[in-house]
């Protein structure tokens, strides 16, 4: 069974974090949290979402799994304003999700979870550098890089203790540097990796500008990007594979 009441903005923030990478996903309706883990079709970008029951007005679940079309679900939730409450209830006989908000009722046909891509394992990586910054700072760096290139270098030099978002185009270059005083926190270690800017742009769309974002970075390793939603009761982690440069 599954029945929950949650603020529309909380649910939208959670779904946005996943829909930037995939069109459909499994939602695990655990007793203690709602959880989603998914990887994009190219196996380049991954998302892991955990939304604690404390983020809901009410929440009852018995560890079920449903499959959803994210675009359709977001369309339904988008009918509510941010401060409205959305009521969700699973009809186990029809395998449909009943959605109610402010006088509006709708039903969403679910997808067989077995037909959806298997949830990925998130590797335990030993990444040398950890950067904590504001979502607005990350947004500025990504937008600057996008002006000149389709890939971006994320780099920390342990000697200067600065975080760089760099891009090199055919004729133009960008270097957005954030020193220790500009950041919320920095654990400096040698870290330098190149990434597809398209994926980072998509992930960046979901990250609130006022969020505290933690980035874990290594030498030609995947990058992990963490941020919270729902007043800290929700945690989102992205992982993005690097573009390996040949010598």
Swiss-Prot record:
The keyword DNA-binding applies. It comes from the Archaea. GO terms for molecular function: DNA binding; DNA polymerase processivity factor activity. Keywords: DNA replication, DNA-binding. InterPro entries: DNA_clamp_sf (IPR046938), Pr_cel_nuc_antig (IPR000730), Pr_cel_nuc_antig_C (IPR022649), Pr_cel_nuc_antig_N (IPR022648). GO terms for biological process: leading strand elongation; regulation of DNA replication. Pfam families: PCNA_C, PCNA_N. Belongs to the PCNA family. HAMAP family: DNApol_clamp_arch. NCBIfam families: PRK01115.1-5. Homotrimer. The subunits circularize to form a toroid; DNA passes through its center. Replication factor C (RFC) is required to load the toroid on the DNA. Sliding clamp subunit that acts as a moving platform for DNA processing. Responsible for tethering the catalytic subunit of DNA polymerase and other proteins to DNA during high-speed replication. This is DNA polymerase sliding clamp. It comes from Haloquadratum walsbyi (strain DSM 16790 / HBSQ001). The gene is pcn.
């Amino acid at each position: 069974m599954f029945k929950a009441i949650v603020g529309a903005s909380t649910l939208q923030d959670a779904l946005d974090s996943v829909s930037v990478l995939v069109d459909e996903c499994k939602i695990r309706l655990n007793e203690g949290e709602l959880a989603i883990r998914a990887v994009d079709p190219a196996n380049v970008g991954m998302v892991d979402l955990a939304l604690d029951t404390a983020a809901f007005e009410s929440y009852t679940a018995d560890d079920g799994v449903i499959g959803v079309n994210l675009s359709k679900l977001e369309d339904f939730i988008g009918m509510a304003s941010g401060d409205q409450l959305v009521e969700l209830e699973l009809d186990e006989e029809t395998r449909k999700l009943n959605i109610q908000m402010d006088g509006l009722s709708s039903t969403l046909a679910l997808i067989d979870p077995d037909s959806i891509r298997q949830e990925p394992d998130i590797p335990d990586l030993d990444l040398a550098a950890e950067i904590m910054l504001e979502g607005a700072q990350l947004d500025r760096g990504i937008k600057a890089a996008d002006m000149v290139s389709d890939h971006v270098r994320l780099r920390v030099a342990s000697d200067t203790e600065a975080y760089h978002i760099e891009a090199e185009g055919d004729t133009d270059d960008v270097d957005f540097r954030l020193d220790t005083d500009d950041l919320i926190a920095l654990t400096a270690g040698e870290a330098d990796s190149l990434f597809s800017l398209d994926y980072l742009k998509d992930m960046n769309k979901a990250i609130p500008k006022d969020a505290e974002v933690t980035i874990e970075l290594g030498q030609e390793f995947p990058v992990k990007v963490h941020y919270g939603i729902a007043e800290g009761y929700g945690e989102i982690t992205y992982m993005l594979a690097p573009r390996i440069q040949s010598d």
